[in-house]
């Protein structure tokens, strides 16, 4: 099936320079429409791969079913697959330069299965609306020459939910108790250790999904 690359020459140029600050809008998995058909557009950077395919429930995890196409000489591979919808599981089947195939979760994925499973999940984040204009405006007025005392904290291990043994606090509850604690202790700022989804809890988030 014919499709067109969604990454322009400017996209690949800025990506190679490391200065494409909206590349997440193109990479990963995005619900899309091609020639009147709804589906999902996939893009991943695998510069040393011989070939890359998309596998998932939709093709019975067959690495040969949906082969991606290289985008110019950028090292990026992409593909539009009709019928792939929100909630579908997927991974990238990467044929290495040595000739063997490995399955990889999406480094730009917006959702993932809960451990110990680790497939990426097609999702839609277009409905999310940032509501931090007031905070950003106030932030611009803050003085930058006043003393700072930063409290570094790992959200997953700072406190556990006493009402649900073994479970983490959600961020809404954590925000209230953590803010009260740091103010009481005299801190002015909080630095959160990695908060991206990660498959191994003891890693503290440094091994991201």
List each language-model region with its residue ranges.
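Conserved, mostly hydrophobic/aromatic
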Residues: 44, 92, 153, 182, ...
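Short amphipathic alpha-helices and their capping/turn segments at secondary-structure boundaries
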Residues: 137-140, 175-186
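Solvent-exposed serine/threonine-rich low-complexity stretches and specific carbohydrate-binding patches
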Residues: 63-72
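Aromatic-lined carbohydrate-binding/catalytic grooves of carbohydrate-active enzymes
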Residues: 166-169, 181-209
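Short proline/glycine-enriched turn/loop motifs at strand-loop junctions of beta-rich domains
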Residues: 45-52
